UniProtKB/Swiss-Prot annotation:
Belongs to the FAU-1 family. Keywords: Endonuclease, Hydrolase, Nuclease, RNA-binding, rRNA processing. It comes from the Archaea. Probable RNase involved in rRNA stability through maturation and/or degradation of precursor rRNAs. Binds to RNA in loop regions with AU-rich sequences. This is Probable ribonuclease FAU-1. InterPro entries: DUF402 (IPR007295), FomD-like_sf (IPR035930), Ntdp-like (IPR050212), RNA-bd_FAU-1 (IPR016730). GO terms for biological process: rRNA processing. Its EC number is 3.1.26.-. GO terms for molecular function: mRNA 3'-UTR AU-rich region binding; RNA endonuclease activity, producing 5'-phosphomonoesters.
Length: 424
């Protein structure tokens, strides 16, 4: 076995199937997941945790220690991968300007453990602690605290028998969720090691890898297919779960259930546009009014009219923006690009075409979301201009080779279409 993995969240069924097939031992399953796979709940400590990102369930986090990185690339081939350059629970020292590397540090402690990696550009610290997969130990008021996942009173009393002697010596102990699944002897030995490491300041090897994966629509559709092999699953299950949790569960009780009504309900008269960059950061583009839509069991197509206001020039096209200019753009669940056709507000003449290359767009309530693949194409006075190919190469640190190659393949396909006058 490659390691013990705990999986939580809306992707749990599909990921349990996938990581089991990759020779990982699945532990601490929910009763529902155990029943689906006709197995007993495996109550063993986890080396790695995979779960929904609490601020956006369109992303997952992976944390722990183990050789999982290559498997993550293979499972999520068309998604963005961010690996923290600083390990979770590692001990770092901030400089005088309250930074570490290129990241701001809060609070501005001279030394502390990383309790939030810098996925938003900021490291959050707490006072220095010795950390294992079972517990944290540090000098303080001599108190014991528990993970929110340890809520059974009997279990808390069991753990207190071990931590109370250390509390009396002035050590704080925080029990992590894995502690529920270890023997008293294992925990006792672990606490002893933590105290020694804390007093000897042996923090060099402390910390856990942390990955934040922004899921693409193609990878979610793959997870739909995997889940479908285990339990009844409609197409777009994982997309719809982000907006309609209970409704999807109800729909799937009917083996002939169709996702069409739920997909249609996601489309409002005006749609926002969430343009996600390779580092996971979202840019909100000017949204647009829906002027045409088509939804069926296989997918969806939405055409927007976006009003373009302000000064400046049209990116890539180079023509000045004038009052009343507008953009007609189609978002198609089957296409890895969107064609923006910019028109003059004065005489409705075509000013130019800009093609954004991205993963196929997904729908949330009143919003279109896609992963931007950096490389774009503009058509200006019959001239084809390839934009930001160097940015694609720079941002490839966040993409697996399959996604980089796909972006280049789509760009070449579009160039051929333009040259043959077959752009649709």
């Amino acid at each position: 076995m490659k390691g013990r993995v705990r999986i939580r969240g809306i992707y749990a069924t599909a990921l349990t199937s996938i990581f089991s097939s990759l020779s990982y031992e699945i532990v601490q399953q929910s009763v529902e997941i155990a029943e689906r796979f006709m197995r007993e709940v495996n109550n063993l400590p986890a080396d790695i945790t995979i779960k929904d990102f609490e601020y956006d369930r369109g992303k997952i986090i992976v944390m722990g220690n183990g050789t999982i990185e290559e498997d993550l690339h293979d499972v999520f081939k068309y998604s963005f991968h961010w690996k923290s350059p600083i390990k979770l629970y590692s001990v770092i020292e901030a400089d005088e300007s309250c930074t570490y590397g290129n990241f701001k540090v809060e609070p501005c402690l001279e030394e502390g453990i990383v309790i939030k990696p810098p996925y938003d550009g900021k490291i959050v610290l707490s006072e220095t602690k010795a950390v294992s997969k079972y517990a944290m130990v540090w000098r303080g008021k001599g108190v014991t605290t528990f993970s929110e996942h340890i809520n059974n009173e009997e279990e808390r009393l069991r753990l207190l028998t071990l931590s109370s002697p250390l509390n009396r010596k002035g050590y704080n102990v925080k029990w992590r969720s894995n502690a529920k699944y270890a023997t008293l002897n294992e925990l006792k030995e672990d606490l002893e090691r933590l105290v020694l490491r804390y007093e000897n300041r042996e923090f060099r090897d402390q910390g856990e890898d942390f990955y934040l994966i922004t899921l693409s629509l193609p990878d979610k559709l793959h997870l739909d297919e995997v889940r479908k092999s285990i339990v009844n699953t409609v197409k777009y299950h994982h997309l719809l779960k982000l907006s309609y949790n209970r409704e999807v569960d109800s729909l799937e009780k009917d083996k002939e259930g169709s996702p069409v009504k739920l997909l249609e309900a996601l489309i409002s008269d005006f749609m926002k546009i969430e343009h996600i960059k390779a580092d996971g950061k979202a840019i909100y583009l000017r949204g647009g009014k829906v002027i045409e839509k088509e939804v069926n069991n296989d997918g969806y197509r939405i055409t927007l009219r976006r009003e373009i206001n302000g000064n400046g020039v049209l990116d890539g096209i180079g023509k000045r923006i004038e009052n009343g200019d507008y953009d007609i753009v189609e978002y198609n669940s089957d296409k890895w690009y969107q064609i923006h056709r910019y028109y003059s507000g004065i005489d409705n003449s075509l000013k130019g075409i800009y093609i954004n290359i991205s993963t196929p767009p997904e729908l949330l309530k009143g919003k279109i979301r896609y992963l931007d693949l950096e490389i774009d194409i503009a058509i200006r006075d019959s001239e084809i201009i390839v934009l930001d190919e160097d940015e694609l190469n720079k941002k490839s640190i966040y993409m697996y080779s399959s996604l980089v190659n796909k972006a280049k393949e789509v760009a070449n396909y579009l160039i051929d279409c333009i040259q043959q006058n077959k752009l649709i």
